[in-house]
């Protein structure tokens, strides 16, 4: 079994989850079951799928869960962009979040590509 806590992709995804939860606290109340909920589900899905993949025995299952995590990450990226365009994200936090999301995408996609070679 792989140790997810040693993966940079997991660490970044975990930090990103905390960041998105903090940011969505200030979203309009009418979005609690809309964009707020969607973003929170997406962001929690990323590290959760990394953890689940690490618990799988086969390399192919591990890779499949990392790919699911990446899909959730791309979904979150769009949702964050939409929330920013709607004015829900404080301007001072946009760059910080954008950087964290993009960095996580790069690290996770690199991990996925390296596993596909084997």
List PLM regions with ranges.
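Short, C-terminally biased terminal segments at protein or domain edges
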Residues: 1-118
């Amino acid at each position: 079994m792989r140790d997810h806590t040693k993966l940079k992709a997991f660490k970044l995804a975990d930090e990103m989850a905390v960041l998105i939860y903090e940011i969505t606290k200030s979203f309009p109340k009418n979005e609690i079951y809309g964009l707020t909920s969607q973003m929170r589900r997406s962001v929690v899905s990323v590290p959760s799928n990394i953890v689940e993949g690490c618990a799988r025995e086969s390399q192919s299952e591990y890779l499949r869960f990392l790919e699911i995590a990446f899909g959730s990450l791309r979904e979150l990226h769009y949702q964050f962009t939409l929330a920013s365009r709607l004015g829900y994200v404080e301007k001072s936090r946009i760059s910080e979040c954008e950087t964290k999301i993009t960095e996580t995408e790069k690290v996770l996609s690199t991990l996925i590509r390296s596993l596909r070679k084997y």
